[in-house]
Amino acid sequence: SHSYAGGPSVYRTAIDDPSLEAAGLRLLEALDWHGPAMVEFKYDPVDGEFYLMEINPRFWGSLALPVTAGVDFPKLYYELATGGVDEPAFDYETGVGCHLLIGELSYLYSILTDDYAFIEKPALLPELVAIGRSVVTEPQFDYLALDDPRPFLCKLGALACELPSLTRDLLAGPLTS
């Protein structure tokens, strides 16, 4: 669920942090892992440190970001598996952002419908403006591409099927947790 209380990321930015890369590689080498993997760290603003969250032996949900930034991991994996490339290049553009648009909408919807006792609810209008501005200035999306709109249309179709229950929830008022 993409809620103001937390959940999967809906907007990501490509950064370059050699210390995180080195830490992730050390973990994968210690596991003798070969193949795609996601090593996730979470930043703690209190102490300024990154902490390991999880290691998943698969491609990750936010795969559109590195592809948009210039590293097509699925293609590289295919090329490595078929002998098409000996040493892959991982040069990418930092500062590139990518949206999960359905997640952004779900986040805004949660502001209207959810109520969490220990988490301050953000104001809808500033969040709507911030997301709108970000979508205009960083128009890269996980499922929405003008040259291949079908994945986004499928997601939109699935959302349309949920519309009756979403409307019912909205009219019922905030959910409390």
Residue ranges, per PLM feature:
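Secondary-structure boundary/capping residues
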Residues: 36, 64, 86-87
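Short acidic-glycine loop/turn motifs at beta-strand connectors
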Residues: 45-47, 82-83
